Amino acid sequence: MTQHRFELRGEFVELHALLKLLALASSGGAAKAMIAAGEVSVDGQTETRKACKIRAGQVVRVGEDEVRVE
């Protein structure tokens, strides 16, 4: 498993934007498709809302990649 850290610069980041910023998805459209397909989990729960607000302390997982948001 590959672990990543992401430092927020505001209160939250939308899930699809986070995947694109960390290059876990090749584009915004690809990120939205991955989320819609149920390939992304937030804090251990499958997340299908592309604009889900991700805040500090949450953990996002896509395949073998895990992102800790700080």
Segments predicted by a language model, with ranges:
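A detector for short, charged/polar N-terminal pre-domain segments
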Residues: 1-13
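A basic, amphipathic helix-loop patch mediating RNA/tRNA/ribosome contacts
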Residues: 10-56
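A positively charged, amphipathic N-terminal helix/segment that binds anionic biomolecules
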Residues: 4-5, 59-70
